Amino acid sequence: MRIISKERLHHLREKYPVGCRVELLRMDDIQAAVIGTKGTVIGVDVIGSIMVSWDTGSSLSVVFGEDLCRRIDDDK
């Protein structure tokens, strides 16, 4: 697990505010959603994990420094 700086955590919380939409690009978890799955951010925790309510019903977080997602509501 990587340690996140206060500055980086602040940046993540600004980039991924509650309610924004994201798309999963990479997740290293046996129960991971399919790459390309979309979801809604429900928060960013104190270790930098982006908490997501996936459209599939899953709620696995995107782990800082391990997994990857991108914000998609900017695509509109």
Describe each model-derived feature in a short phrase.
Residues R2-K76:
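Basic/aromatic-rich interaction segments and small domains that mediate binding to polyanionic partners
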